[in-house]
Every structure is written in structure tokens, then in C-alpha cells.
Regions:
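N-terminal basic, amphipathic alpha-helical segments
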Residues: 1-85
Length: 85
């Protein structure tokens, strides 16, 4: 289960916060390549946010190459160069 403390900050949206936290976890190697991420509904429920917020964050990470999706399977972490802690 991925749980993040998200709070909307002035000038940013919840989707941007979630996107940044997921991206950081991927780059720091906390979420390893090939890992299946929670479904949009599951992550939304666990973090008290909307499915649309999760979808927006996931889609941005796909566009940037951090995630890839498999139809009817979900979202997975792509192989990216990890940053040192």
C-alpha cells in the first residue's frame, strides 16, 4: 500500500503533489522497476483523493517515461536511472 500525506498547497494541485511523491520514490529506488502500482481506485481510496487525481498523476508519469501501462493489467514502474539517497 502506498500512502502519502497530501495537502493542497497554494499554487499546486493534489495531482502535482502525488506525481512528485511517486516520481521521487521511483528515482530514489523506493519503488523498483517492474513494480505494479496500486489500481487508481485503490490508491485514491487509501489516500482520500479522487480517482481523477490518481489518473492525472499516473498519466503524467507515463508521458515522462517513469511508468508504463498494460491494458487491463495496470501501471508499472519503468526502468529508470535511480538517484542516490
Amino acid at each position: 500500500m502506498l500512502h502519502y500525506e497530501l495537502e493542497k498547497k497554494k499554487g499546486s494541485s493534489l495531482y502535482e503533489e502525488l506525481y512528485q511523491k511517486l516520481k521521487e520514490d521511483i528515482l530514489r529506488g523506493r519503488i523498483l522497476p517492474g513494480t505494479k502500482l496500486p489500481s487508481k481506485r485503490e490508491l485514491a481510496r487509501d489516500n482520500g483523493i479522487s480517482v481523477k487525481t490518481v489518473l492525472s498523476a499516473y498519466e503524467q508519469l507515463v508521458v515522462e517515461g517513469y511508468l508504463y501501462s498494460k491494458e487491463k493489467k495496470g501501471y508499472f514502474v519503468a526502468a529508470v536511472e535511480a538517484m542516490p539517497e
